[in-house]
């Protein structure tokens, strides 16, 4: 090999890029986009589907401001992976991505995302038995023209980001029982969960039945059944939700449970036997609401008790301080007779005792003299004596039994379901399905990672909406990366060793991407090579993902 050959050898960090592109291929993102949007393959240099695919990979791989993408991919040596495709990095510029987003906005993006989600579901031979749905808010900065007639409006609303100072839009999504996305929808920033949840469930039932997915159980938080009207909307639909406290029967049933019911001990629901895992007990019954029978599962858990103890202690401390202030104010008032003082004391003590605090009271008598003339009184000066009565209260500790009852009530909640088959879905399984709601909350955490959008992507609300659907595709790819690795670990009885030496069977998508971050690839004479000394940790992660090392030596197959 001469010196010129050595100079033509280039080593670069391929990172997770080939893996992410392959995941997009499995999802058929480019094909689905190209099939749904209007574009002319003979005129377009790069298909809109491939541009959307590149955008997904960019967002997942790059945790930096999302603009000047062309420069970014040039630094990543993407031209080596695109070689022989007829596409250059220069064609992957911000304007091209903006045009692709504009094309995306012309189609039913909710349907597009659902199609892609089902592609992944079928590729992994998975089913839909239950769906968990929820929303999250995405805060944005900038000025936007608002058309009140639009279905999608960037505006102020209840912020789940704790940023009420910023305008926002919302993302509603649903995941199946394994926590994998099956639908996503962009919502106006002020869209209420109470409106969206029942609406979305009705729409999803129709859509998925059309795809031959039947008898799905829909699981949502208490916003799903916030009113009698919400329950009417869900008639004929299998659902599980938490009955909110605004239904008076909830407090009545909790009170009944406090008095004593035949609890069924469930124990832990966690897959692991980790110390401190939440333990549950349940009590089942059937009652009618608005003339329709439902199953109810009363649930008590020690985990909520631990969470609520500090909250309640703060509440009780503040409550006692307020009572002591009121007692002090009353203690400064002068009463003309004992009866008046006792009457005032009785009213206050009734209030204190209703809040379950111990209280003691005593009346003090104070005699004051009023002399007939001003100045220092003499021994012979006449005076008039006035007797006043003051009532003093001492606020004691709160009654132990009352504290215990409050903790019980706060640690107990009521599940409602229209699934009446107790044999197939006993109470513990209804609870387990509801607790699976955390899977979508975990999925949303990945969307909360900072992704900064450049000016071209925020130029108009329609483009922001299209970008929001790209975020849902990012969530899809991230979820399946986790699923593939975790399933492989579970099936093989293996585990991932974390940097701190701990074993894990549930590595996060961030961990997976971090392991692949240092993959080095050699480019020489038009070919790609993976060095022989590639870290075994990287090779093992590829194995868990279901890919061979060859994924790094193949060029990207561009979809036109």
Q: What are these regions, as identified by a protein language model?
A:
Residues 1-21, 30-560:
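Anion-binding and metal-coordination hotspots
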Residues 27:
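Substrate-binding/specificity loop regions of serine endopeptidase catalytic domains
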């Amino acid at each position: 090999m001469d010196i010129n050959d050595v100079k033509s050898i280039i080593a670069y960090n391929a990172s997770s890029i080939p893996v992410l592109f392959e995941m997009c291929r499995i999802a058929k993102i480019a094909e689905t986009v190209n099939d749904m949007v209007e574009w002319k393959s003979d005129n377009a240099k790069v298909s809109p589907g491939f541009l959307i695919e590149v955008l997904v990979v960019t967002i997942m791989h790059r945790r930096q401001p999302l603009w000047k993408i062309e420069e970014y991919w040039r630094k990543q040596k993407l031209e080596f992976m695109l070689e022989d495709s007829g596409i250059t990095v220069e064609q992957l510029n911000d304007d091209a991505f903006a045009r692709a987003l504009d094309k995306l906005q012309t189609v039913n993006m909710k349907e597009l995302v659902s199609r892609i989600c089902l592609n992944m579901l079928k590729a992994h031979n998975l089913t839909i038995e239950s769906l968990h749905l929820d929303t999250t808010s995405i805060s944005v900065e900038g000025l936007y023209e608002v058309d009140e007639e639009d279905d999608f409006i960037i505006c102020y609303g209840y912020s789940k980001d704790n940023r009420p100072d910023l305008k926002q839009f919302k993302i509603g999504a649903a995941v199946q029982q394994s926590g994998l996305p099956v639908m996503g929808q962009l919502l106006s920033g002020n869209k209420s969960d109470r409106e969206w949840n029942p609406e979305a469930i009705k729409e999803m039932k129709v859509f998925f039945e059309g795809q031959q997915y039947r008898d799905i159980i829909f699981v949502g938080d208490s916003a799903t059944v916030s009113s009698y009207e919400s329950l009417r909307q869900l008639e004929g639909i299998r659902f599980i939700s938490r009955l909110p406290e605004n239904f008076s029967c909830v407090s009545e049933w909790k009170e009944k449970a406090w008095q004593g019911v035949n609890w069924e001990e469930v124990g832990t629901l966690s897959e692991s036997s980790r110390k401190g895992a939440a333990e549950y007990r349940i009590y089942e019954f059937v009652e009618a609401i608005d003339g329709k029978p439902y199953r109810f599962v009363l649930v008590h858990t020690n985990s909520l008790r631990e969470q609520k103890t500090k909250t309640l202690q703060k509440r009780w401390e503040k409550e006692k301080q307020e009572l002591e202030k009121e007692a002090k104010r009353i203690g400064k008032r002068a009463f003309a007779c004992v009866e008046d003082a006792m009457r005032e004391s009785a009213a206050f003590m009734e209030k204190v005792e209703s809040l379950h605090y111990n209280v003691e009271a005593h009346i003090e008598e104070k005699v004051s003299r009023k002399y007939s003339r001003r100045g220092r009184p003499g021994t012979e000066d006449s005076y008039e004596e006035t007797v006043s009565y003051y009532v003093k209260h001492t606020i004691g500790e709160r009654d132990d039994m009352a504290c215990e009852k409050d903790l019980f009530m706060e640690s107990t909640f009521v599940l409602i379901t229209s699934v009446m088959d107790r044999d197939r879905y006993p109470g513990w399984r209804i609870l387990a399905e509801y607790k699976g709601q955390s899977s979508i909350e975990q999925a949303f955490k990945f969307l909360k990672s900072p992704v900064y959008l450049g000016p071209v992507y925020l130029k108009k609300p329609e483009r922001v909406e299209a970008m929001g659907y790209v975020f849902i595709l990012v969530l899809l790819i991230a979820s399946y990366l986790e699923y593939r690795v975790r399933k492989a670990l579970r099936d093989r009885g293996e585990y991932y060793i974390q940097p701190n030496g701990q074993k894990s069977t549930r590595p996060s998508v961030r961990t997976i991407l971090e392991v692949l971050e240092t993959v080095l690839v050699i480019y020489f004479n038009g070919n790609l090579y993976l060095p022989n000394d590639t870290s075994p940790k990287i090779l093992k992660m590829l194995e868990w993902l279901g890919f061979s090392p060859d994924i790094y030596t193949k060029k990207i197959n561009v979809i036109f």
